[in-house]
């Protein structure tokens, strides 16, 4: 049976429909997104929440000539459906399939690549200013969630856009669903909630909303002055208008009768405009509406019942970290935990339940999180900042200037280090070893398995110095638990002794290195395997022992430039080992952006699995 949605291969085709058909398009789009994501997994709730908004934006604005930028991009599945990628949606986040975010190389309707939060207003403002500079008449539209709006970068862009940019054709659509990934926190979220619940405000907006649907451009200036005068009598000036934006809303983001006339009037007006729309995350799929955190990023599920397919059943590294941190916090009342709007993703929801007074969700504000932790540390608190490796990049200056330079005891627990799989290049934890090891005073550890993670967390708590431990996404190895203990700083370990060559690995690749040694053993090649444990400081005695093999392969799951291998080469060079004919190679993430796919697929492609490690070492041996 042919659906209406199947006839739409571009926004131009959408705009040819009578607007009375749009609710049918919305229902069919929801069904299609649910069908595809139930098979592939992906970001379900955010995309379901903006179906009507997505359709309305493409119906009113002349995309791709008008620029449409989706903040983060995980709500863009409907956008992909309308822009020629409908039949590929089932491949989303899979190897050689669609990206889970917007991507410039994927479509001309994706003018800006996204993945990290709160970049859309800055990017759209740049596009709007460039259009003016080039003499082009077009709108730049940024769609940003209320969670992302709480980040510093978004406020920086609002501040700039509203200042002396009255001719700027910029529209910011605030998609207010009271969620980022976890429920929103902070004063902005509270402000929006108060504004929505205010009786006088809503009575006023109900009246002005009716006028807005019919107002002409010629009446606008007078109406604006009148609105400001009357509004001042019934409510304080809104935050956004004080920043220099013309504010409209809030309107129902699921109601075409509200969306279309409002967007048409917004399209006619100049200057920076903020349109506030109210949506429900997971709209149209009851399990996602009732459990928005669970269905934010979801594994394949039964589309009829909503039951999510179970994973392998093992314990994740994230959960191992969270459970051990809770155990340590039972003994140490000075331990506090900090997250930047990722309490479930980092496992700190477990900590929050047990120690709510020592748990801090700062919102999407990584820079603030790090300096907030530094302030806590000055007063005898031991803060643990649990953060994805890719988001640690956003607070590098704070890590150096506010933590390391002052030698403050802050623990950075870097989750999703290395290859992350389906989220792709924007979320790869590929750089932390490279940028952290340059910082004086930092101790850096990378566990090979869950027992090592427990040991290293105990070591970090005991150290009383700036320290980072990085661990991968996914299920731990399922090893029998060992009693956790404090490790000697800067000491690695010997896992296997051989005669012909040595593999020196750190972090996740340690166990694949052991498997590679077993493969080579079957071919008559005897290989030693070492676990460095510490990237900084390095175990100099261990390096001397490794170099004595004459043939060395260094393996890490980090960018090969500037990472662990580079540190080993620098140290061996200083020891003079490279002057004595040592054959050494470094394996890691190559100097390119690794696309999305499963971790197993990606490790196989770049040679960071057991077979790839064995093959590389055999080639090195000649």
Swiss-Prot record:
| Keyword annotations of the record | Isoprene biosynthesis, Magnesium, Metal-binding, Thiamine biosynthesis, Thiamine pyrophosphate, Transferase
Free-text comment on the cofactor: Binds 1 Mg(2+) ion per subunit.
**Which cofactors?**
Mg(2+); thiamine diphosphate
Q: In which pathway does it act?
A: Metabolic intermediate biosynthesis; 1-deoxy-D-xylulose 5-phosphate biosynthesis; 1-deoxy-D-xylulose 5-phosphate from D-glyceraldehyde 3-phosphate and pyruvate: step 1/1
**What is the E.C. number?**
2.2.1.7
Q: What Gene Ontology terms describe what this protein does at the molecular function level? A: 1-deoxy-D-xylulose-5-phosphate synthase activity; magnesium ion binding; thiamine pyrophosphate binding
Which residues does thiamine diphosphate bind? 74, 115-117, 147-148, 177, 285, 366
Top-tier EC class: transferase
Q: Name one GO cellular component term.
A: cytosol
Asked if the Swiss-Prot or TrEMBL record annotates the protein with the keyword RNA-binding, the reply is no
Q: Matching InterPro entries, A to Z?
A: Dxylulose-5-P_synthase, THDP-binding, Transketo_C/PFOR_II, Transketolase-like_Pyr-bd, Transketolase_BS, Transketolase_C, Transketolase_CS
Enumerate the catalysed reactions. Answer: D-glyceraldehyde 3-phosphate + pyruvate + H(+) = 1-deoxy-D-xylulose 5-phosphate + CO2
Q: Which PROSITE patterns match?
A: TRANSKETOLASE_1, TRANSKETOLASE_2
Q: Record's Gene3D superfamilies?
A: 3.40.50.920, 3.40.50.970
Per the record, the domain of life is: Bacteria
Q: Does the keyword Cytoplasm apply?
A: no
Q: What GO terms describe the biological role, i.e. biological process, of this protein?
A: 1-deoxy-D-xylulose 5-phosphate biosynthetic process; isopentenyl diphosphate biosynthetic process, methylerythritol 4-phosphate pathway; terpenoid biosynthetic process; thiamine biosynthetic process
Q: Which Pfam families match?
A: DXP_synthase_N, Transket_pyr, Transketolase_C
Family membership noted in the UniProt record: Belongs to the transketolase family. DXPS subfamily.
Q: How does it assemble?
A: Homodimer.
Q: What does this protein do?
A: Catalyzes the acyloin condensation reaction between C atoms 2 and 3 of pyruvate and glyceraldehyde 3-phosphate to yield 1-deoxy-D-xylulose-5-phosphate (DXP).
PANTHER family under this entry?
1-D-DEOXYXYLULOSE 5-PHOSPHATE SYNTHASE-RELATED, 1-DEOXY-D-XYLULOSE-5-PHOSPHATE SYNTHASE, CHLOROPLASTIC
This chain belongs to the protein called: 1-deoxy-D-xylulose-5-phosphate synthase
Query: What would be the name of the gene that encodes this protein?
Result: dxs
């Amino acid at each position: 049976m042919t659906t209406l949605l199947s006839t739409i291969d571009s926004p131009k085709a959408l705009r040819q429909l009578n607007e009375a058909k749009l609710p049918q398009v919305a229902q069919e789009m929801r069904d299609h997104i649910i069908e595809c994501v139930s098979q592939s997994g992906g970001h379900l709730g955010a995309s379901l929440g903006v179906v009507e908004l997505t359709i309305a934006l493409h119906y009113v604005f002349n995309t791709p000539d008008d620029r449409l930028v989706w903040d983060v991009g995980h709500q863009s599945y409907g956008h992909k459906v309308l822009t020629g990628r409908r039949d590929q949606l089932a491949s989303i986040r899979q190897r050689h399939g669609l990206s889970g975010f917007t991507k410039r190389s994927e479509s001309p309707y994706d003018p800006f690549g996204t993945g990290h939060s709160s970049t859309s207003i800055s990017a759209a403002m740049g596009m709007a200013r460039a259009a003016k500079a080039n003499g082009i008449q077009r709108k730049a539209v940024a769609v940003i969630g209320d969670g992302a709006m709480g980040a510093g970068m978004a406020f920086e862009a609002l501040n700039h856009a509203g200042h002396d940019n009255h001719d700027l054709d910029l529209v910011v659509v605030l998609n207010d669903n009271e969620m980022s990934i976890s429920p929103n926190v902070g004063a902005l979220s509270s402000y929006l909630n108060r504004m929505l619940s205010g009786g006088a405000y809503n009575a006023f907006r109900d009246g002005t909303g009716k006028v807005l649907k019919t107002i002409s451009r010629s009446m606008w200036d007078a109406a604006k002055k009148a609105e400001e005068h009357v509004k001042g009598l019934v409510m304080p000036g809104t935050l956004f208008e004080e920043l220099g934006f013309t504010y409209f809303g809030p309107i129902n983001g699921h109601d075409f009768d509200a969306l279309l006339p409002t967007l048409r009037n917004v399209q006619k007006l100049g200057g920076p405009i903020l349109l506030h729309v109210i949506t429900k995350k997971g709209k149209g799929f009851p399990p996602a509406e009732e459990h928005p955190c669970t269905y934010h990023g979801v594994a394949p599920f039964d589309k009829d019942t909503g039951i999510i397919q179970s994973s392998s059943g093992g314990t994740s590294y994230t959960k191992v970290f969270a459970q051990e941190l809770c155990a340590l916090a039972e003994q140490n009342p000075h331990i506090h935990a900090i997250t930047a709007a990722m309490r479930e993703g980092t496992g700190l929801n477990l900590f929050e339940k047990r120690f709510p007074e020592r748990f801090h969700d700062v919102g999407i504000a990584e820079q603030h999180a790090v300096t907030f932790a530094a302030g806590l540390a000055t007063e005898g608190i031991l803060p643990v900042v649990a953060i994805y490796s890719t988001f640690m990049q956003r607070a590098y200056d704070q890590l150096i200037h506010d933590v390391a330079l002052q030698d403050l005891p802050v623990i950075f627990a870097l989750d999703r280090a290395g290859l992350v799989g389906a989220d792709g290049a924007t979320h790869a934890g590929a750089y932390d070893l490279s940028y952290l090891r340059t910082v004086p005073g930092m101790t850096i550890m990378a566990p090979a398995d869950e027992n090592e993670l427990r040991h290293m967390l105990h070591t970090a708590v005991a150290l009383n110095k700036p320290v980072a431990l990085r661990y991968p996404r996914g299920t731990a190895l399922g090893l029998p638990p060992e009693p956790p203990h404090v490790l000697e700083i800067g000491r690695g370990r010997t896992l296997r002794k051989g005669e012909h060559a040595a593999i020196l690995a750190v972090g996740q690749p340690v166990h694949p290195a052991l498997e590679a040694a077993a493969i080579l053993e079957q071919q008559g090649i005897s290989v030693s395997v070492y676990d460095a444990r510490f990237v900084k400081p390095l175990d100099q005695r261990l390096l001397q022992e490794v170099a004595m093999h004459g043939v060395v392969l260094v393996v890490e799951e980090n960018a090969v430039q500037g990472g662990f291998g580079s540190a080993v080469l620098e140290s061996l060079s200083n020891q003079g080992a490279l002057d004595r004919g040592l054959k050494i190679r470094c394996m890691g993430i190559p100097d390119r952006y690794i696309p999305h796919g499963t971790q197993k697929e990606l490790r196989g492609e770049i040679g960071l699995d057991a077979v790839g490690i064995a093959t590389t070492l055999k080639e090195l041996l000649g």
